[in-house]
Amino acid sequence: LWMPRYRFYTYPDVMVIKDKPLYEGKGTNTVTNALIIVEVLSKSTRDYDRTDKFKFYRSIPEFKEYILIDQYRYYVEQFYQQNNGEWLFKASESDKDTLRFNSVDFQMSLLDIYQRIDFNLTEE
């Protein structure tokens, strides 16, 4: 993913593009128009993902939704842009919660997101 305003490349864990991808340069390796970006947080990247990286992503005109998934517990942060340009925040913290996307018609329970995750394993 290329962000021309900051002259910055990054590789999100997941991204969703609406309609046709727009590419940087003549190749077809690097897109510039992510609608939704999902990052799985680790202890080493979580602060960066929440601050500078989110700032870089917000420079993409098509970007409307940012999902941060904690890998150590049931916890998902959702940021989405309203029509007036303001960003709203929602946190889901229970295995009974459902993540409902605002930019596309899709939802997924946290139980499904965290399926087969063993929270008792320690980070190495």
Feature roles, as predicted:
Residues 1-60, 65-124:
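C-terminal interaction segment
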